[in-house]
UniProtKB/Swiss-Prot annotation:
Active-site residues, record numbering mapped to chain: C334
Organism lineage: Bacteria, Pseudomonadati, Pseudomonadota, Gammaproteobacteria, Enterobacterales
Chain's role: Catalyzes the formation of 5-methyl-uridine at position 747 (m5U747) in 23S rRNA.
PANTHER family for this protein: RNA M5U METHYLTRANSFERASE, TRNA (URACIL(54)-C(5))-METHYLTRANSFERASE
Protein name: 23S rRNA (uracil(747)-C(5))-methyltransferase RlmC
Gene3D superfamilies reported for this sequence: 2.40.50.1070, Vaccinia Virus protein VP39
Binding site for [4Fe-4S] cluster: C3, C11, C14, C87
HAMAP family (alphabetical): 23SrRNA_methyltr_RlmC
Length: 375
């Protein structure tokens, strides 16, 4: 992938950009095999990759510069701002949005937040696009509600310029720290969730719910899990750390009893909305801590699917799964190091199948799917 920002030494986020995709996949596969070297693996499936550019459905832009000439991008470690509107990871559809946002910021008087001086209001612009209909969600992350009235007043112009903006919100993040969002979300549109669709499964994206940033690869990940589950003799499963329900909704059949657990209420609201659309009445989604939910149960389902954050599922949940011994565990991980550490804590299981998904091209990161079977 060619990138003018990288070539000019202005951005180094894509550290592997000079390597061809097959070389990147080989290096990632070697890393994964090294991490799982102590475990016999019955089947290594071919790695899955997607487009090498224009694949991201989300932009997280630090707003810097001046109110008259805002920059959207990032801050270097020394505080120097860098505009990333031309980043080739973003689809072409993002360019007109960035172009309209700059004069809008000036018109609405949204002074960019200055980290060094601890002054200003607009901290971040967060943009998400649906692959199914091109609709977009735009979030303004502000330090306070001081400029909210001005933003509301100027908003009709932006909506006229960009009719693809279906959901617009203001998030209030008052803390002087590099935290992307605060707890308060103020909706400026009637619509509160962005409709998405993977493999004919309706999904919803809300402001404070996690959603994969590489839809081309994520849709293949979900489809693969569905295929793996359909091959297993199970009618009951848990989907832990379920997010907006992507895995569970793909796996569910009318006679499958499924419980999805996720700590974020916004994500659970999305999952419930999708289940209702599909008419699946045996799916139950709850906003709870996954580890606390599981370890409080006196019995375990035949299949437990886990998709934890980078820290992994942790020893308490590993100990519970070791003791209760479900027939199958499907582990989806964005950090193979912690996954390998967790598998070490599950001695009663063997690794039936492993597949790498290149969710983050041009970096060392990847997603991995592992099927564990009770010995």
């Amino acid at each position: 992938m060619q990138c003018a920002l990288y070539d000019a030494g202005r951005c180094r986020s894509c550290q592997w950009i000079t390597q061809l995709i097959p070389e990147q996949l080989s290096a990632k596969t070697a890393d994964l095999k090294n991490l799982l070297a102590d475990f016999p693996v019955e089947e290594w499936c071919a790695p899955v990759s997607g487009p090498e550019q224009g694949f991201r459905n989300k932009a997280k832009m630090v707003v810097s510069g001046s109110v008259e000439k805002p920059l959207l991008g990032m801050l270097h470690r020394d505080g120097t701002p860098e505009d990333l509107c031309d980043c080739p990871l973003y689809p072409a559809s993002f360019a007109p949005v960035f172009a309209a946002l700059k004069p809008f910021i000036a018109c609405a008087g949204l002074t960019p937040y200055n980290v060094a001086r601890k002054r200003g209001e607009l901290k971040y612009i967060l943009l998400t696009e649906s692959q199914s209909d091109g609709g977009m969600m735009l979030r303004f992350v502000l330090r306070s509600e001081t400029k909210l009235a001005q933003l509301r007043k100027a908003l009709p112009w932006l909506q006229e310029q960009l009719p693809q903006l279906k959901v617009i919100t203001v998030n209030i993040q008052p803390v002087h720290m590099a935290i992307m969002e605060g707890e308060t979300e103020i909706y400026l549109t009637e619509q509160q969730a962005l409709a998405e669709r993977f493999n004919d499964v309706p999904l919803w994206i809300r402001p404070q719910s996690f959603f994969q940033t590489n839809p081309a690869v994520a849709s293949q990940l979900y489809a693969t899990v569905r295929d793996w589950v359909r091959q297993l003799p199970v009618k009951h499963m848990w989907d832990l750390f379920c997010g907006v329900g992507g895995f569970g909704l793909h796996c569910a059949t009318p006679d499958m009893q499924l419980t999805g657990i996720e700590i974020a209420p916004e994500a659970i609201a999305c999952a419930k909305q999708s289940a209702a659309e599909l008419g699946l009445t045996r799916l139950q989604f709850q906003a709870l801590d996954s580890t606390q939910f599981a370890t409080a149960q006196g019995e375990v389902q035949e299949l437990v699917l886990v998709n934890p954050p980078r820290r992994g599922i942790g020893k308490p949940l590993c100990d519970y799964l070791s003791t209760m011994a479900p027939r199958f565990i499907i582990y989806s991980s964005c950090n193979a190091q912690t996954m390998a550490k967790d598998i070490r804590e599950l001695p009663g299981f063997r690794i039936e199948r492993v597949q790498l998904f290149d969710m983050f091209p041009h970096t060392a990161h990847y997603e991995v799917l592992t099927l564990l079977v009770k010995q």
